[in-house]
Amino acid sequence: MVTKNYLIDKVHDKLDYLSKQDVKESVDLILDYLNESLKEQKRIEIRNFGNFSIRKRKFPESNKFYNTVYYRMPKNLFKD
């Protein structure tokens, strides 16, 4: 499973000229921006990774609605 700490470690391995704290702050900023964008009902498109958006869903037993994150991956994500 990929966690935030795992992601920070991998980015730090690739960009070893940055301190781990700088990488952590960068990852936190990116995730915060993505989170805020979804809260504002904005669509997020990351080329060659996928699209994220908010969809309204209805509870089956009631007329109440809730928001859920919808992810659509590109067709070529798992092609070699």
Curated annotation (Swiss-Prot):
<keyword id="KW-0238">DNA-binding</keyword>
<dbReference type="GO" id="GO:0003677">
    <property type="term" value="F:DNA binding"/>
</dbReference>
<dbReference type="GO" id="GO:0030261">
    <property type="term" value="P:chromosome condensation"/>
</dbReference>
<dbReference type="Pfam" id="PF00216">
    <property type="entry name" value="Bac_DNA_binding"/>
</dbReference>
<comment type="similarity">
    <text>Belongs to the bacterial histone-like protein family.</text>
</comment>
<dbReference type="InterPro" id="IPR010992">
    <property type="entry name" value="IHF-like_DNA-bd_dom_sf"/>
</dbReference>
<protein>
    <recommendedName>
        <fullName>DNA-binding protein HU-like</fullName>
    </recommendedName>
</protein>
<comment type="function">
    <text>Histone-like DNA-binding protein which is capable of wrapping DNA to stabilize it, and thus to prevent its denaturation under extreme environmental conditions.</text>
</comment>
<keyword id="KW-0226">DNA condensation</keyword>
<dbReference type="GO" id="GO:0005829">
    <property type="term" value="C:cytosol"/>
</dbReference>
<dbReference type="InterPro" id="IPR000119">
    <property type="entry name" value="Hist_DNA-bd"/>
</dbReference>
<dbReference type="GO" id="GO:0030527">
    <property type="term" value="F:structural constituent of chromatin"/>
</dbReference>
